[in-house]
Amino acid sequence: MMEQSLIPQTPVLPLTAQRTVKRALTLLDRHLRETGVAFTSTQAARDWLKLKMAGLEREEFMMLYLNQQNQLIAHETLFAGSISSTEVHPREVVKRALYFNAAAVILAHNHPSGDTTPSQADKTITQRLVQALQLVDIRVPDHLIVGGRQIYSFAEHGLL
């Protein structure tokens, strides 16, 4: 599984705050992996993703792999790009979802600019990913865009 720095080193966040956020992420991650804890809504995923992705300086595409009961199996950053884009490959997305034997995946990426409005490219790749994953019976409950403290939900806007 690919690893990423939990807290980016930035002059905006003091070291003590970075440590606090890192501890919070660890506790939340542990809680989400407990037996019986499920993503019955995407709120838990949103809270976790805000902590995880809000301070990133370049665009990254992440996946949360869920089992049949919507419990978190694993998560990883699949692709990383520049400050304004990242290239996402549907073949790799499907391959990783199958590797984890996921029944569902929550897609997520960040917009370092802070503007969570999806681009046409975001909408197009989301549809391609949903179609590719449907071919192997994997659900996509949501695609979330993190920008600062804001999150855009494709599901809430009827784009899935």
Swiss-Prot record:
Annotated Zn(2+) binding sites: 109, 111, 122
Motif (JAMM motif): 109-122
Domain MPN: 38-160
UniProtKB keywords: Hydrolase, Metal-binding, Metalloprotease, Protease, Zinc
Pfam families assigned to the protein according to its UniProt record, in alphabetical order: RadC
UniProt-recorded Gene Ontology molecular function terms: metal ion binding; metallopeptidase activity
GO biological process, one term: cellular response to heat
UniProt similarity note: Belongs to the UPF0758 family.
Protein name per its UniProtKB record: UPF0758 protein YfjY
Organism: Escherichia coli (strain K12)
